[in-house]
């Protein structure tokens, strides 16, 4: 939360070479870009779904090529040499951006924190896992002022080690190295973040100006932050360090802190530990008039080569630097780990003051402590200072007891900060099986751990026998398909959570999710558990099958049967190796955010859902990591299989449900059907025979979008063609296997 929230800009210069700019800091107005580009389809039709969202990182954009294997390259890396080089950079001040106290540690901590800290629990977006801080809008957020300099300082290291270390890993690793170089013992570190090569469209907020808040709060008088946002303010990581909407109220700020850190999966103790620990190092920057700070990197003149916020206040750097507009040094030891942040926080009474840039902050009252805080460049000593949000840790009952305890027990703070910092840096990386490097600690509860395989796996003969038992069990194709989808369809590609591995469909909270039809699971799971138990009790050589594997295998057997019933023999690939997690290794509260509000693949939406269903379908497809064609074929196939939630007939455009046919597409595109909104059922459409007026089908927007949206209609036409019935089956099976294996990182 070390929030150097800086300067912004007014309208852009009219010529490419014009370098003058005006800016305001710390209150930053919106950029006003001028563009001669033609209007896009989204400009003309903003409510139309954008299928291109499902293809955010095309292979052609990757200069390393499709065959590049980051894990293979990383294995060649000398991580100790890398750490030594990062620390060397950190302790070698550069004239073009001089280091406070001769050490860039505070800057690097902030860079890593602000990369990882964009993570949000409601949709798993954000985080440092792809190196997105290099690109717009994050590289130009007001909260990220001067982090462009931090990344430039690291360029010699990246240049030296090349493909063996990604930018995503290096940005996060640098902050970890900073802590260690200043005497802090970290909990561990994992590499494994792969770079992307272009920005991704993420809804960070609907405000059209920096530091805006009006669109993310409902205006009902309640300060209830809308989902899925993780920050109170457009362009900030968490909260305004001057207080809500710049009002210096530490108690109100504490409420915002709790909400935003909670949306990053941090509890109160973890939140307090991160703030205290992070603010034990470095300083903020607000040396003078913020109007003298130039435009952000994306708006800076071309000759600045991607560096932004050039300041004409004095030298613009070092003692004259302006970043957040706040001028705070928290401790007398800003390059050393100790307990002086809390000793300072509780050792003085505080009064509200303003920085040289006009930002609200607190200073020790009545001149107390004058001269005890060192100047970063050898000038006269300073008075103790704190952010409004620092005072929250003392004044708010939410955090007071926690920080008071740490004042007397610094070893507890060190342990809490080490674990919270590790969680911050790795929250978006998924299972430990994805982690690389020698410093990976034991799996933590928040990482949704699954036990290792400790037995021989089933072979092809076992798989065939188990399929026969499943199909002879009395369970129907829709039941088996829906159960497998309920397990695997919980996966989120954003933060690599959910999925079938772990068998958590049988555990709380997933067992009772409305989307998963608990009453149906109560029928299906006991049957599968009996098959599992019988096999494990009788199999030779100690072979076993987990329920997680059997759920997927059963769904795949149902798909094979459905394809056969449609006239196609096909084998659905199955890779055993999933294991069953325990309820004790499942954080119920943490998993609750994975519960789907809607799943268009099952034609499910919670009652009263107001968002357009087709948009929610697209979002679910995005989270699953499927493409436009894969989304299309999956919806059509699942409708044919009768896999709708609650057995609904919406979108089941076939007279032979349970067979894997392309009837959904054929009948959707039939011009003999005329569609209209139902007069009796909300969010339902009726398809009537155009000649007789007889009711033929019912549907939701999840179905009709494949005939309405021009891109999806083009895909639907492919699968409706007479010569593509076999292709439809093959493509459905391939997409099905992809979803079933999304969380099988051991296979990738």
Curated annotation (Swiss-Prot):
Free-text cofactor note: Binds 1 heme b (iron(II)-protoporphyrin IX) group per dimer.
EC class (word): oxidoreductase
Sites marked Transition state stabilizer: 110
EC number: 1.11.1.21
Catalytic-site annotation from UniProt: 114 (proton acceptor)
Modification after translation (UniProt): Formation of the three residue Trp-Tyr-Met cross-link is important for the catalase, but not the peroxidase activity of the enzyme.
Coiled coil: none
Oxidoreductase recorded as keyword: yes
Crosslinked positions (Tryptophyl-tyrosyl-methioninium (Trp-Tyr) (with M-264)): 113-238
Keywords: Heme, Hydrogen peroxide, Iron, Metal-binding, Oxidoreductase, Peroxidase
Similarity field: Belongs to the peroxidase family. Peroxidase/catalase subfamily.
Function: Bifunctional enzyme with both catalase and broad-spectrum peroxidase activity.
PANTHER family assigned: CATALASE-PEROXIDASE, HYDROPEROXIDASE I, BIFUNCTIONAL CATALASE-PEROXIDASE
Protein name, UniProt field: Catalase-peroxidase
Gene this chain is encoded by: katG
């Amino acid at each position: 939360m070390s929030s150097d929230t800086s300067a912004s800009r007014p309208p852009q210069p009219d010529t490419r070479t014009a370098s003058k700019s005006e800016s305001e800091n710390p209150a930053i107005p919106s950029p006003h870009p001028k563009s001669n580009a033609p209007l896009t389809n989204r400009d003309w039709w903003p409510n139309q779904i954008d299928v291109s969202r499902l293809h955010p990182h095309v292979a052609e954009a990757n200069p390393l090529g499709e065959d590049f294997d980051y894990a293979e390259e990383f294995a060649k890396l000398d991580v100790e040499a890398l750490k030594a080089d990062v620390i060397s950079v950190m302790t070698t001040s550069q004239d073009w951006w001089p280091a406070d106290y001769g050490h860039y540690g505070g800057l690097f901590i902030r860079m890593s924190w602000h990369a990882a800290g964009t993570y949000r629990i409601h949709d798993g977006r954000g985080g440092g896992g792809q190196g997105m801080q290099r690109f717009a809008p994050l590289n130009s957020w007001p909260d990220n002022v001067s982090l462009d300099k931090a990344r430039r300082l690291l360029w010699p290291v990246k240049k030296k080690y090349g493909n063996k270390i990604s930018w995503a890993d290096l940005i996060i690793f640098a902050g970890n190295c900073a802590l260690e170089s200043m005497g802090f013992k970290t909990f561990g570190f994992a590499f494994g973040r792969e770079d992307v090569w272009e920005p991704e469209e993420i809804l960070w907020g609907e405000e059209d100006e920096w530091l805006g808040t009006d669109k993310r709060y409902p205006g009902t008088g309640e300060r209830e932050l809308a989902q899925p946002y993780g920050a109170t303010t457009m362009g900030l990581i968490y909260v305004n360090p001057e207080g809500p909407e710049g009002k210096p109220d530490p108690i109100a700020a504490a409420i915002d802190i709790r909400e935003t850190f909670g949306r990053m999966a941090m509890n109160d103790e973890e939140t307090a530990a991160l703030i205290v620990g992070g603010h034990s190092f470095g300083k903020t920057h607000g040396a003078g008039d913020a109007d003298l700070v130039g435009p952000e990197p994306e708006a800076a003149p071309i000759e600045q080569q991607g560096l932004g916020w050039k300041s004409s206040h004095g030298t613009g750097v070092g003692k004259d630097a302006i970043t957040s507009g706040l001028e705070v040094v928290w401790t007398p030891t800003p390059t050393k780990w100790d307990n002086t942040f809390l000793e300072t926080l509780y050792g003085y009474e505080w009064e509200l003051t303003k920085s040289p840039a006009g930002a609200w902050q607190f200073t020790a009252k009545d001149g107390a402590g004058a001269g005890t805080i060192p100047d970063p460049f050898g000038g006269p000593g300073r008075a103790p200072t704190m952010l409004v949000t620092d005072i929250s840790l003392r004044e708010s009952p939410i955090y007071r007891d926690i920080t008071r305890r740490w004042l007397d027990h610094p070893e507890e703070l060190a342990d809490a900060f080490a674990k919270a910092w590790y969680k911050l840096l790795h929250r978006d990386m998924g299972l430990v099986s994805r982690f690389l490097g020698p410093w990976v600690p034991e799996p933590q509860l928040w990482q949704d751990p699954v036990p290792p395989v400790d037995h021989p796996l089933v072979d092809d003969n076992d798989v065939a026998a188990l399929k026969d038992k499943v199909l002879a069990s009395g369970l129907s194709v829709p039941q088996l398909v829906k159960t497998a989808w309920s397990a695997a369809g919980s996966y989120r590609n954003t933060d690599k959570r959910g999925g079938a591995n772990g068998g958590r469909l049988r555990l709380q909270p997933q067992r009772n999710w409305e989307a998963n039809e608990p009453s149906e699971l109560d029928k299906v799971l006991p049957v599968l558990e009996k098959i599992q138990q019988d096999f494990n009790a009788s199999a030779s050589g100690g072979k076993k099958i987990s329920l997680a594997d059997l759920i997927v295998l059963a769904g795949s057997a149902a798909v094979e049967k459905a394809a056969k019933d449609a006239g196609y023999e096909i084998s659905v690939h199955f890779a055993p190796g999933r294991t069953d997690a325990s309820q004790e290794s499942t954080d119920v509260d943490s998993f609750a955010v994975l519960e789907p509000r809607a799943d268009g693949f099952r034609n499910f939406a919670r009652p009263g859902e107001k968002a357009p269903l087709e948009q929610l379908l697209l979002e679910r497809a995005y989270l699953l990591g499927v493409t436009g064609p894969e989304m299309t074929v999956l919806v059509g196939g699942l409708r044919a299989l009768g896999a709708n939630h609650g057995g609904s007939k919406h979108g089941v455009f076939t007279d032979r449900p349970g067979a894997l046919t392309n009837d959904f597409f054929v009948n959707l595109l039939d011009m003999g059907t005329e569609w209209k909104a139902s007069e009796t059922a909300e969010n339902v459409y009726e398809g009537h025979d155009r000649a007789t007026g007889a009711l033929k089908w019912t549907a939701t927007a999840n179905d009709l979008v494949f005939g309405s949206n021009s891109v999806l209609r083009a895909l639907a036409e492919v699968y409706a063609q007479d010569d593509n019935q076999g292709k439809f089956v093959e493509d459905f099976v391939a997409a099905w296997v992809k979803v079933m294996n999304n969380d099988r990182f051991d296979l990738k």
